[in-house]
Amino acid sequence: MLVLLAAIFVVHIATCVMLFVSTIANVWVVSDSINASVGLWRNCTSGDCSGGLSYGHEDALKAVQAFMILSIIFSVISLIIFVFQLFTMEKGNRFFLSGATMLVCWLCVLIGASIYTHRYANGDSNTFDRSHHGYSFILAWICFCFSFVVGVLYLVLRKK
């Protein structure tokens, strides 16, 4: 049981770190023809990330930014709640609050990544002729899977 809790804790920390990286890094879509990438915040060309996004004023992008930031917040809150429950909760109880908070994080990642996929990652809306998904986009979807698994495991596990 202790090994399982430690493994879940490590995956939860990895999820928090990957959420930070995927939200902050400007590599959601990468151009195949030129050395350029686009993120949630900036457009990077040849290593220079000083240019803003041409569609930065759109509500869909602002929603993606908001949901990704909310997912980070809920993931960190869930981690703090888990550590608190680990030391204060009576034996035999389940980690309901940690699990519920992590599932809210999962929902925020789902909404944010889905909006970005629909609006910007299909190739029609970005400024590149040929492009592919960057590591930030892929990390966001990996965090989607991890946060769901961690949230469900928190709901199922009991403290022994």
Swiss-Prot record:
Family affiliation: Belongs to the PMP-22/EMP/MP20 family.
Cellular component terms per the entry's GO annotation: plasma membrane
Keyword Nucleotide-binding appears in the UniProt entry: no
Superkingdom classification of source: Eukaryota
UniProt xrefs under PANTHER family: EPITHELIAL MEMBRANE PROTEIN 1 (PTHR10671:SF6), EPITHELIAL MEMBRANE PROTEIN-RELATED (PTHR10671)
Transmembrane segments: 1-21, 67-87, 95-115, 137-157
Annotated tissue distribution: Most abundant in squamous epithelia.
Membrane topology designation: Multi-pass membrane protein
One Pfam assignment: PMP22_Claudin
Protein's recorded name: Epithelial membrane protein 1
Alphabetical keyword list: Glycoprotein, Membrane, Transmembrane, Transmembrane helix
InterPro entries the UniProt entry points to: EMP_1, PMP-22/EMP/MP20-like, PMP22/EMP/MP20/Claudin, PMP22_EMP_MP20
Residues carrying sugar: N35, N43
Subcellular location: Membrane
